Each structure stands twice: as structure tokens, then as C-alpha cells.
Amino acid sequence: MNYFFITGTSSGIGQALANVLLTDKNNIVTGISRSVTINSENYRHIKLDLNDIESVSKFDFGELKEPEIICLVNNSAHFSESKHYGKADTRDIIKNYNVNNISPGIIINNFLSAYQSYNCKRIIINISSGAATTAIESWSNYCSSKAALLMLSKVIALEQSLNYPSDPVKIYSVSPGVVDTPAQERIRNTSPENFSMVGKFIEFHEKKQLSDPVIVAEKIAKIIFNTDNFINTEIHVNDIQI
């Protein structure tokens, strides 16, 4: 069997990826989020708020019997309210780094602790963003947290190559592009006073330039099942053909 742990399965890319994987009865998907939106015989759900660090710290991966693939997908993210620094809400800043950095770090650490010694394919995919490498006004929290997650991916990849050169856990930072998700709707509803680029994102939507989450999910699945073809830690879905 193949086992998948995906954060943020209630909507967007996480939900789409879970549904894509669940088309194969050999795949068991565990969703990690605050709400359940998927009903499938092979779907399990763990209700967990990634802003609650104490609860996340207690989360533990269980023992798996004869797995062929074990994969963690850190998809969940908090997109802070678009405001310039000096006007940002302190609680929103804390939530951003809790959800986008601290919780993924804890979950990755627990995943490696649980499954490093397993004799099967083990994969970690961190969903990144163009914001990880581009400064965007009013997105200070999101840009910096995605940049931190990208660097975490690179460091773990380095550690795996040094400590387990013949059998590393594969880790990828995958940038999905501009995807039609609830986060995009929130961006389009931002006041131009707080985000001068809002018109560009409205145009993306009007011109139907947003990627379908299902297509993005299918490309992520291609990475998972073809890791030998993906050498670099950083991947953009636009470079993947399906």
C-alpha cells in the first residue's frame, strides 16, 4: 500500500490531490486539517489546527505495515491579510508563521523520526510559491514564510544526502503557480489601498489564467510516482508535462 499524509485537504490543492490519489485503491490518504470535506473508503482524517502549536507538537505518525510509498505533503498555508508592515495585525503575523513554518517543521521532524528507517520510498513535498523568491508588497508574512520553507527543504535535502546517501528521503519544494483556490478570491477582494497589485490578480481571474487545482494535483502526483526523474529540490509545476 501507499500512504499519504496531506495537510489542508478541506479545499484547493490539498483536496484535489487527495481526490486524485484516492482514484487508486492502493493509496490510503490521511488528511490533516480542521474540517472534513472528503468521503472515501481509503480516506482517514485527523482534525488538527496548525495554528495550535501545542496540539501539533503532540501529533505523531503511526506505524505502517509493509508500505511501498510513504509521502508527506505540507500543503496547508495561511495567507495573511494584505497590509503593509506597521499596519499588520500581531495575531495574524503569529498565525502566519505558526501555520506556514513552525507546524510544517514539527510535522517534518516527526515524519523523519517515524519513517527514516523504513525500507521503502519516502517523500516529503512542501508546497511553495513564487512569493518564496519574489518580494511582493503587502505580502511580507507570506513571502518570508514561504522563503523559510524553501530553505528548510534545501537544508533537509542536504542533510539526507550527507547522512543517507544510498537511501535518502526525497524532499521537494513545489511551486504550483497561480491556482484557482479560495486564497485567490481573498486576494481579489483586497482593497487597492492595501495592495496596489490587486488589479493584476483580478485580471488573472477574468482572463481565466488561473490553473485548475486538479491539473496541479496531477502534476504533483507525477512527481511522487516518478521521483527518479526529478533530481532538483525546487520544482515548478509549469515544467511538468502530464
Show which residues each predicted segment covers.
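Active-site loop-to-helix junction immediately N-terminal to the catalytic Tyr of the SDR YXXXK motif
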Residues: 135-143, 155
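Active-site helix of classical SDR
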Residues: 108, 145, 153
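Residue(s) in the substrate-gating loop at a strand-loop-helix junction
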Residues: 129
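C-terminal helical subdomain
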Residues: 173, 181, 191-242
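N-terminal Rossmann NAD(P)H-binding glycine-rich loop of SDR-like oxidoreductase domains
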Residues: 10-19
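Rossmann-fold cofactor-recognition segment
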Residues: 40-54
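Conserved mid-core segment of classical short-chain dehydrogenase/reductases
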Residues: 78-94, 113, 138
